[in-house]
Amino acid sequence: MRTLSLLVLFSLLTAFVRANPVEDSVKAKTPFKDFSLAQVEKGDVLVNREGLSQTPMVEAIQTCFLIKASVGTVTSTLVNWNPAGKSGLDVTSHQVLDSSVSADSFQSKLGPFLSGSKGGGWIAKQSHDAKDSSCELMLNDGEKSLLAATKTPDALLHAWGTILAKRYASFRGKGAADFSSLLSAVRQIGPLEVSSPSGGTYYWELSDLDGRGSISEGVTWQDGSRVCDGEFFVTSEYTASFDVSTLWPVTVDGKSATLVWRIDSALSPQFADLKGAERIASGSLVLSSVKKAIEAIRQKAEK
């Protein structure tokens, strides 16, 4: 009987030692049901695209990966993330926005972009053709009319500054309606305050996507153990994005590290028209972009 009791005790102790609360949490909260820390210790990124979006216009991807830096360092990196100039990324300028902005707030960076870059030149041409059906800029009718009416570079610059200032003020005042669609893709995370992020860092960016320019505005904020990033205005490729990273502290080789479960989602009317192979190809492009961002964030945090 005593031998049996010792065996039972040994089994319980062994189970306790082997139990990993972070691994259990990942298995319970994410689609990575067979997860173990060993799967990501060497830098691999786990990917899952199933069961996220209930909206045809939303493309969403989940990833799980390790960053060999403390949770505090990773949180700071994500909240203050500046992708401009990072290898493999398309962002050429990232600027933090004050609580109050005007059309003039954007001109120092926007002017050289529109007149001196390939992507900016594409934006300028699309702006002049904004009332034409061929225009690919994702703007409302009023914004298109404002751009199409411009006759000089200075007028175009001011028009874009006006659009950005109004979009920013609108989000700060009312929130972005597009975020409600994107929430379907992150419903597994839990309740999130997205209409008016508390303590958020607002920013705007200029990007050059192989000669196709993009102008965007967004906000990054911390929500407990999660870091959220949402673009509420994007001119090209998609209309809004919403990303959430959940962070767990772990120890790897005796050093502090961070396990990240990340959901990336983007909204575009174009996604609804994609079927079969086209939809798969679209998802592959999104995944490629996400992996490049993950690698850049990892390199920054691990420095």
Model-derived features: positions:
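Bacterial N-terminal signal peptides
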Residues: 5-15
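Eukaryotic helix-grip
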Residues: 20-303
